[in-house]
Amino acid sequence: MPHSEKPVDQERIVERVQRHGDSIWALIEAQGMATRAPFPDPRTLRSFSLGEVAEILGVSGSYLRQLSIDGLGPTPELGTAGRRSYTLGQINELRDYLASSRPKEALKFCPRRRQGDKLQIISVVAGPASTTTSFYLAQGLALQGFRVLAIDLDSHGSLSGMFGYYSFGYPVHNASMYAAIRYDDDQKSIRSVIQPTLFDGLHLVPGSAELSIFEEDCGRLFRSENFKYPDASSRMVSALKEVDADYDVVVLSCGDGGFLTAGAYEAATGVLVTVRPEMPDIVSMTSSLYSFTHFVALIERAGRTVNHDFFKYLVTRHDPRDVSQQKSIAMLREPLGDDLLTATVWESDAIRQAGDKGRSLYELSSGSVGRSSYEQAMKSLNSANAEIMDIMSEVWGRAPFYVSQASRSTTAGKASSESRGLSK
């Protein structure tokens, strides 16, 4: 069929689309957004009830209430009927107060690195719910008092979007990890791209389309050097050394970039692989394992040793009522043994609904997504995070206690005493 003929002076489709894009971008620039991209969605973090704070800190609500009455520690906000609530910043102030007033339990209240403890760098391999896992792990660690840096290595900025940072797919200049690892004269310190988040003690290096430029640069070097492995991953290691003293944990959320993923593997002290207990996902996960061994072989061929303190697997999107999934988990347990975490993260409408609201469950109260679903999801999330924190504790030579604490509590987002009208 011949193309329809149009008058010479009629605007072509491609020209109209170009005009649309230019016009909309001009409006965005006029509002001052384009110059700040990736820019955060303006939102605030809710306060936490006294019952929630008691669970997070592992103390009783009556003890916290008495501290408030005695004027000790931060002053909580008083709401309806005198109910007390604390910001996350105030929770961390409470940590410092409790650590100083109860020195024998200082590590419980203030679990940050001590002298001689190495920075924990956890690489979360791209897979089922891996971005969500990175998101909840980073926020969960921050709620427990750790200083956390989350790094989005996805050129689509998936993790960044969860934190409220949006780049619209544009390769914004030096706004991602690319700034710290690029090969040209525009290389900057990683500090220049670290952004705040809603969570006190949790920072983010956003992802951006410019990360794909790094992949292209590495590919050209790889080919031009007769397939000798370039120093792409050692650049990641060097960049993180700049902020070694500033954080306790770094969470590297991997995307689909090969060289960036290799960098995450070399920099990591531990690796976390997510897997959904369905056969196609298990096959895909197995491919990721072969990719890991391939990347490590290339790095070691370049004369650098790759060592990890742990390599763990986490079952995500688990439906415990699905018999076939239970069989798949049992099948995985045989070859993986203790490397497969005991906790699983359940398939959850609450997590999906929170995502639809552009929030995490930690940012919402139970009434926002349904109390029963909320509490169930929080229990599975907190159980998985507790296992990972116990692994970190063992690496630092500490006795693990997070799993036992999680088993005694309800959820970090649920205050059972408050629901009975007791927490004020």
Residue ranges and their predicted role:
Residues 261-279:
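Inter-motif core of Ras-like GTPase G domains
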Residues 144-150, 156-206, 342:
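Phosphate-binding loop that captures ATP/GTP phosphates
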Residues 354-384:
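C-terminal boundary of histidine-terminating zinc-finger modules
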Residues 187-200, 206-262:
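Cytosolic-facing regulatory segments adjacent to core modules
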Residues 208, 317-324, 328-364:
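Beta-strand-loop-alpha "switch" segments that mediate conformational coupling across diverse proteins
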Residues 1-109, 422-424:
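Long, basic/Gly/Ser/Thr-rich N-terminal segments
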Residues 115-157, 161-162, 198:
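Walker A/P-loop phosphate-binding motif and the immediately C-terminal alpha-helix
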